[in-house]
Amino acid sequence: IVESSYGHSHPGSAHLDKLVDEAGIGIKEKGGRAANYFVTDICDGEAQGHDGMNYSLVSRDIMAAMMEIHVKATPFDAGVFIASCDKSVPAHLMAIARLDMPAIFMPGGIMKAGPNLLTLEQIGTYSAQYERKEITEEQFMVYKRDACPDCGACSFMGTASTMQVMAEALGIALPGSALIPAHLPELKETARKAGEHALGLAREELKPSDIMTIQAFENAIMVHAAIALSLIHI
């Protein structure tokens, strides 16, 4: 199974279909056949400032449950799980742990920054400046337009970036796969490798419980402290 949070609801997931395709090629090259399943996610950024944020955390749990349903309803030999963002990455990791089937997580990468290293987190500051009439509406609209120039997780060390790093530190994602810029060809190449490795895990009968051990979690905690990642991962 190739499970992903692909969808058009926000830039973090809009490109994941391309990674799904690459993972499928990797699976095919190793003698397997991919079945693509999708449970798209919401964007915490879009959910802020209104009642939408009340649905954020529960969306993670429902996504994990739906992925479990997908796998249990039609048994598979292995899985590639592909996601980028705040609730989708934890949801995929939860599903992987629950299912304990040979599986690999493929991070969806990170979007590049806008002009002058503009990122989405700065829009709140510019919004306040606009309300105080310190910048013009035209300036504010330019910032809003350029804050998310392409696909991938938001380009700052928030929940999405943190969880991609944590997946790699836990050993459930390929080394070097976290936070690859989404516009680079290396991201697709890594997705294909993830598909290839999934077949290897199945043949070796290597499960997440064999990989995400106490030592792996201790390693992830140390990596988190070393990089000063977001505390919301807890």
Give the location of each predicted region.
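Flexible, glycine-rich loop/tail regions that form catalytic "lids" or insertion modules at the edges
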Residues: I221-V223
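Active-site cavity-forming subdomains of large catalytic enzyme subunits
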Residues: S56-N219, S230
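Conserved small/polar residues in nucleotide/adenosyl-binding loops
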Residues: I232-I234
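Long, structured ligand/cofactor-binding scaffold of large enzymes
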Residues: I1-P102
